[in-house]
Amino acid sequence: MKQIEQMILQAEQELKDAFARIDENETVRTRQVLDAFRREGVSYRHFAPSTGYGYDDIGRDTLERIYASVFHTEAALMRPHVASGTAALSLTLFGLTRPGDRIVSATGMPYDTLQGVIGTGEDTPPGSLKEMGVLFECVELKDGKIDVPAVEKAIKADTRLVIAQRSRGYAWRPSLFPEDFEELADMIHTKHPGVTLMVDNCYGEFVCEDEPTDHGADLCVGSLINNPGGAIAPTGGYVAGKREQIERIAGRLTAPGLGREIGSYDASYRPFYQGLFMAPHTVAQALKTALLASQLFENLGLETTPPSGVRRADIIQAIKMQTPERLVAFCQGIQTASPVDSMAMPEPWDMPGYDDPVVMAAGTFVAGASIELSADGPIRPPYTAYMQGGLTYIHGRIALAEALKRMIETGALTSPES
């Protein structure tokens, strides 16, 4: 439809300054990554696979030093064997807590899948932290920000870990910037030096000029099929932070006493190196796609968060569709414009780990990769679509046009021509 193209051109004109700021951030972060690669002298030998125990695996060890350099931390654990972001978070929580310890969440209830790890509900899965005797307490955000006095009050003598989620998850709240953790970190380090601050950094890497570990967080945790994998890494997760804590977490992954010294990968490490190098650019493309979505749907009268004109803390764009028909049609349009499984037609289904049916569009090269263009949302009011990713801005542009077309064709959205 010509009218949809005109809408996109208008939105792009309104976003010129915001796009320029994204380009500036991409330059800063690309230089940081490039400098880390050059310091480590990366060459073809680092891409070679390893087998067996993986002793002295130069590709693995060098890549972990690069991750530590990029996040400005003492050490990092980056492994293909970590199945997801939730798996990396689970590894961290189990590695740092013992029976009788308490975890305090500083950003409200965590993402649905992490609730199962902690054991927050009545029907907790076997092997949860709750089953192991780890206690959990939740402090809600105050006006979209961390309520530091309330977190301080929640910290008891048995508190071992304070966790914070940078991204919104399936919640209508602002995502947090790296500097938003500074006051919390200062309070913990000054008044409770035995407590560790861990930030779930999923969807936030490379969005800003720095990371939570630059502002006092002890640990950052994330998935390689999200931002830092640059849409090239096929699997994996990372933890970056203090050396002592990284060793404890590594002992949970392999075995105490072995830690980071073992762990082979019988495939090339090249995708992990190349993905990390590409990450600042790929994240920039995803941010531009998110901005375009926000501007387009705001111009149509729908509520979005973050709004189009504000600084961004992660790659997720939330849009209140208000009806299940709009949400489903939007996701179907995104799927139709995907390079993989474009013929599929997403429908709501009972996805493991979620309380409500979820509709999900994910025509990605790497299964479940959120840095590639995808959209999803739970079938519950106000029927919010959560869109993220985009290998290229041009693809995101095409996909949003297809999504609008699908919404109009199904009657979920009134044609702008009418």
Predicted regions and their residues:
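Short beta-strand to alpha-helix junction loop
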Residues: 55-59
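Short glycine-rich or small-residue beta-strand-to-loop segments that form or flank ligand, phosphate
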Residues: 50-51, 77-80, 315-320
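Short, well-structured beta-strand/strand-turn elements
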Residues: 74-81, 340-342
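Conserved PLP-enzyme active-site core in the AAT-like
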Residues: 2-18, 23, 33-39, 43-46, ...
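Acidic, PIN/NYN-like endoribonuclease modules and their adjacent C-terminal/linker elements
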Residues: 26-30
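Conserved C-terminal alpha-helix-loop-beta "cap" of PLP-dependent enzymes
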Residues: 298-417
